[in-house]
């Protein structure tokens, strides 16, 4: 059994290009299923039927696992059984069609346009300031994922065309435009840092790509230094990019392409943010909004 599980994770890593973070989550999910099977003495997980999987989901739910975590756990199980079917180890996928309780989707927190512009406009009178300005401007200008920004090398930056080429989820390559302010900041940082094609745009302490944790800590420090009340984190800049772009353009499909979302339903969360903003405008401005009739 352990060999099959190892082979499955090798498939996810090599053929599906799954990140180490996602692989760890999947290992926990499949591990939970195996542990439940042992505890219930129901045999090997390859032999579980649909009713037993439903019992597993119910047990996890009773244990207090959130709806979102349950959905991911079921997704891992579906993928595992689908792989077993494809390899001929079992005849049918017992997890196909199984559903977890629906998760309440939280709306992402964003900076408004004025907050975002104020935040990224930090002084550039030191090399560190040049780097930080370029990093923040690029985040907000192009809506990159944290992993994409950390892995970016100068060879993937076309300062003349105003484009960056990044490796997204599932090892999918995409090209995204860079705004004029971010381009200006990148040019200054390139001139200061050297900018060799194979060099990371944002190097870490030892010359390799900067770590995700280092970026998170730095953004938190910069936000605190500016006295911002909100807890600012890298993904908030990506959320802000998407929301502001959708608000001004209304082009959901275009925003999907720029963000690198494989499924447009992932992008649709930003339409709810836009509606939330419009609702606030209505409540504040309309003479009949939320007022008791006299």
Curated annotation (Swiss-Prot):
Pfam families per UniProt: Phage_int_SAM_1, Phage_integrase
Gene Ontology, cellular component aspect: cytoplasm
Keyword annotations: Cell cycle, Cell division, Chromosome partition, Cytoplasm, DNA integration, DNA recombination, DNA-binding
Active site: 145, 169, 235, 238, 261, 270 (o-(3'-phospho-dna)-tyrosine intermediate)
UniProt cross-references to Gene3D superfamilies, sorted A to Z: 1.10.150.130, Intergrase catalytic core
Keyword Heme: no
Cellular localization per UniProt: Cytoplasm
All residue ranges annotated as the Core-binding (CB) domain in the record: 1-85
Domain Tyr recombinase positions: 106-283
Single Gene Ontology MF annotation: tyrosine-based site-specific recombinase activity
Single GO BP term: chromosome segregation
Origin: domain of life: Bacteria
Additional free-text comment from the UniProt record: During infection by the bacteriophage Xf-phi-f1, it may be required by the bacteriophage, which may use host proteins XerC and XerD to integrate the bacterial genome.
Similarity field: Belongs to the 'phage' integrase family. XerC subfamily.
Function: Site-specific tyrosine recombinase, which acts by catalyzing the cutting and rejoining of the recombining DNA molecules. The XerC-XerD complex is essential to convert dimers of the bacterial chromosome into monomers to permit their segregation at cell division. It also contributes to the segregational stability of plasmids.
Subunit structure: Forms a cyclic heterotetrameric complex composed of two molecules of XerC and two molecules of XerD.
Name this protein carries in UniProt: Tyrosine recombinase XerC
